[in-house]
Amino acid sequence: MRARRLRRALAALLAVAGLFVPFIVGVPTAYDGEPVFVAIPVEHVNTLIGTGTGAAIVGEINNFPGASVPFGMVQYSPDTVDNYAGYDYDNPHSTGFSMTHASVGCPAFGDISMLPTTTPLGSQPWSAWEEIAHDDTEVGVPGYYTVRFPGTGVIAELTATTRTGVGRFRYPRNGWPALFHVRSGASLAGNYAATLQIEDNTTITGSATSGGFCGKKNLYTVYFAMKFSQPFSSYGTWDGYAVYPGSHSMNSSYSGGYVGFPAGSVLEVRTALSYVSVDGARANLDAEGGASFDDIRAATSSEWNAALSRIAVAGRGPGDVDTFYTCLYRSLLHPNTFNDVDGRYIGFDGVIHSVASGHTHYANFSDWDTYRSLAPLQGLLFPQRASDMIQSLVTDAEQSGAYPRWALANSATGMMSGDSVVPLIVNLYAFGARDFDLKSALHYMVNAATQGGVGLDGFLERPGIAAYLRLGYGPQTAEFRANGRIAGASVTLEWSVDDFAISRFADSLGDTATAAVFQNRSQYWQNLFNPTTGYISPRSAAGFFPDGPGFVAYPSGFGQDGYDEGNAEQYLWWVPHNVAGLVTALGGRTAVVKRLDRFTKKLNVGPNEPYLWAGNEPGFGVPWLYNYIGQPWKTQRTVDRVRGLFGPTPGGAPGNDDLGALSSWYVWAALGLYPSTPGTTILTVNTPLFDRAVIALPTGKSIQITAPGASGRNRLKYIDGLTIDRQPSNQTFLPESIVRTGGDLTFSLAGTPNKVWGTAASAAPPSFGAGSSAVTVNIARPIIGIVPGATGTVTVDAQRMIDGVDDYTVTPTSYVVGIAAEPLSGQFDDDGAVSASVAITVARSVPSGYYPIYVTTSAGDSARTLIVLVVVAEAVE
């Protein structure tokens, strides 16, 4: 996509940055000769990739193409009309530029909007937009963006520092006078308040108060200071109802203003943000905004080049390299710096605090989305930043009483479900972060997991925890509501993962007692496994599963009752810490292969069909499940198919990027690795996309990946063998220590599947089954009517949950004279299942009424008791 023009622009930029070499080496493919490592990775980032609209299921991808630094406070980027995340490449109408952005799924950010224009002001400038040119004049590279407005002739260029956006705007000489709109009351989620102050003839300051993310109650206020390179000759304000020429200030939820300049002006506009105060924004501007536009642009490019150089790749065509480095770039945009240059920031308690010198306080954690693949990547590449991220969350908890869920600015939105901040923290820690308050971090995890985690303004980190601990699962009650539907099943699955992460973290700190408790709790997902249907299903507080099949097709809406953004088939596979236990529950390897083959027949279906939704987070790890069941060649094939959903185009992603979640998935998949088990450093493998790759570890060591034949016209798609530090390995996963010590991985590849390598049971990645129940039970019809003197039967469905358990017994107990049922015993079938018929006899002497029978099913060292209600009534003739 405009690659030649993009590379020319980058060549000029890199020369200014001091990064230019005598010539820019193109990326050779394997058939060009020996693959050469990419020398300048910023040359291969195109920020317009993934900024458009995908297919019907994909919808808006919601990436922004504008200027930012790694993990910066500012994301200075264009906006298009009626796009809730800011920008859509397929939309030709632009409202200008704003200072904050993220690839979110609800209206958010877009704070402090500005529009350079020559169109006369008119009576409603707060609604103004201009046509934007999505052609070869629109260029986006790390730290720089430029675009043309064909209707007015204005050319805009943007660059950024951590807390400042710098714009250069060229107005046409032969045209209307230059105008510059500033809209503090135009945040994408709307504004509860906004101010604007024209302080002198080169300075505008103000604030925007926004929030209400996805209908939640969060609020934040961001302040700004804006400095123009030349005095303006006219000015005014508006309030969303009228325009006030000559007015210096405005205080309205629709606040805005304008300033005017002569035709042909070339303006540099520097805008700094602060979440503390206008004075904080001024100080940030003074500290970061003094250099020339070109010098800032070059420095930002250098910063990005250093960050992206943590991973070097060689081989493959330019399109794949561009996709890879653009995805790596997007993996380093969030979370965001939240403190000013002097260290001050607004806390969750509404009080101004200061972060320790040399550290950064971060905000904006889309935890449910990012803990799976983004947190491991950031922890591996940037452990010191990752440490500050964890400490920021720990500090948030200390200020508010609990960890936030989907933290935006300085408050918890409560968006999504689960307690996903826990595996986010533990993944960052496992992959390298160490410099934070470990004791306090564990304390707040355990507090929420046992007491609920009471935060501010009614926020609960784990709502419904008392019922969860009493029942061993999240029931279908209001406390387990998520995104408009009650999601007890998916919450239970998430909390099982969360508790496993707590167990691993506690164990690493030497707290073996806590580790054991939460390891046992990590198996609570088994309490929702319905042996009648073979699904992990929602369950009532009384213990009943829904009637009918486990998967229910919904022709509309956003998923199935009991599940957050998905359905029973999609969530079935989310037991990453005990895949072996799930395989046993589903009847063993052969049965699971058939089911997984059917599930991956389609790759990106959305929340309502019983197939993989590759663009949504619960399905991220599915392609690697074949590594657990003896068919790793299908992992290699499926990962390759999903990678094909990405590409170097505006529509080149299978879903909403969710603050780098989807992009980080691609980075791992392209390297041939995936962090399969949250809370651990287990990396399971697939065929790499590049002939060579090097992951530079901060310790000075590296992970070297060699896969001859991965690139080229006739690329080899299947793993034929693997050596780790020159030792042959038949395992489909790497030693956990490799993320610390580094190592050399050499993949031997082939054009056809090797159906021997990696197929042994010992080759599967580890599962953590301690605390598992040996059996799960359901009685689909627990109410039975029997007339006196007759016998009825109920069916007990049971499923073995641990391999090696062969025998079961069913013991019905009645405490009513005249009602009897005989015990029975037997062996599970080859799939570990049984449907046992229990005969219940009612004597003629038993009066009409309701009588419970307690049916206990035992296997191994586990026993589960369910109640059958016998309704005795005389027959009606």
Swiss-Prot record:
Its EC number is 3.2.1.-. SUPFAM superfamilies: Six-hairpin glycosidases. GO terms for molecular function: carbohydrate binding; hydrolase activity, acting on glycosyl bonds; peptide-N4-(N-acetyl-beta-glucosaminyl)asparagine amidase activity. One of its GO terms (biological process) is glycoprotein catabolic process. PANTHER family: PEPTIDE N-GLYCANASE PNGASE -RELATED, SECRETED PROTEIN. Keywords: Glycosidase, Hydrolase, Signal. Belongs to the glycosyl hydrolase 92 family. The keyword Hydrolase applies. InterPro entries: 6-hairpin_glycosidase_sf, GH-type_carb-bd, GH92_a_mannosidase_put, GH92_N, Glyco_hydro_92, PNGase. This is Uncharacterized glycosidase Rv0584. It holds the Pfam family Glyco_hydro_92. GO terms for cellular component: cytosol. Residues 1-32 form the signal peptide. The keyword Signal applies.
